[in-house]
Amino acid sequence: MIKKAIAKVVERIDLTEAEMIEVMDQIMSGEATPAQIASFITALRMKGETVEEITGAARVMRDRATPIRVGKGVLDIDRDDINIDQETILDVVGTGGDGTNTFNISTTVSFVVASCGVKVAKHGNRAVSSACGSADVLESLGVSLDVTPETVENAIARIGIGFLFAPALHGAMKHAIGPRKEIGIRTIFNILGPLTNPAGADCQVLGVYREDLVEPLAHVLHKLGCKRGFVVFGMDGMDEITLTRETRVAEVTREGVTVRTITPEEFGFASCPPGDLRGGDAAGNARIVRSILDGATGPRRDVVLLNAAYALVAAGKATDPAEGIRLAAEAIDSGRALAKLEELIALTNE
């Protein structure tokens, strides 16, 4: 199938979701050769990946990931009705590769949101283009990455947050590592990670590194069954909601996708220069994360509050971002967010 797929994509013919599933199965099973993998993902990038192609690839990666099982069906009470449903699991994650070298915003947000009572399955990896990815900063903070899937499940169940280290849970990706490194360009694999949470997170805030990915990835999340989510791109290039400029936000609900542009000012925050959000290496970013969770004020806290607000809306803990900002501020100022970090450090080092 992959030979036929390469021939089609070279002619700029889109693949169906079913065709993409077949190709990805060949790639992730080791059936496709390195040359075929490199040719395919390069041609696909030149053509431009469609919603159907990304969705098909994400389905295969999800199916082949080591599963993190969380929740066995709980009484879910929201403002409209009462029903028995799987426990809500949230992921706050970016594609990385935005080149802005900010501190680890989504990682900081994860502890704030978890301390508000949301189950967080934080999916992440080491640095892509910055000096410090989520795995790097967590390791520097004292969180052990060398844990079993059962430990991650236990962390989410017991304390409400666990870190899903992508290389440990996506073993089938090994077949694509060589071709990806050798061609050295961004491909579909750069956007698949945030779509393939092994815990099956059904609520999400997903940051992307290009504006033209916002709406397509929102439609992918919708097709993959996301209950509520936001795909965001800061117009300064950040794969987060930014304070320096406007942010494009695509909201995903059961009904579909809506897109709008937001500004920090509409939520009561002052805009700031990019340097105010910049980070450094793992040790430096760990100090920044801890200082924010310990109550430090300024633009870094503000950007965490705004991103946490949207995460709380996605998880159903806040009706709107304004309520989310208030809840996030309370979580930090009460000490609960910092305590959540300490709990994860302790649990992963037991």
From Swiss-Prot:
Mg(2+) 1 binds at residues 106, 240. This is Anthranilate phosphoribosyltransferase. It comes from Geobacter metallireducens (strain ATCC 53774 / DSM 7210 / GS-15). 5-phospho-alpha-D-ribose 1-diphosphate binds at residues 94, 97-98, 102, 104-107, 122-130, 134. One of its GO terms (biological process) is L-tryptophan biosynthetic process. The lineage of its organism: Bacteria, Pseudomonadati, Thermodesulfobacteriota, Desulfuromonadia, Geobacterales. Its EC number is 2.4.2.18. Pfam families: Glycos_trans_3N, Glycos_transf_3. Binds 2 magnesium ions per monomer.
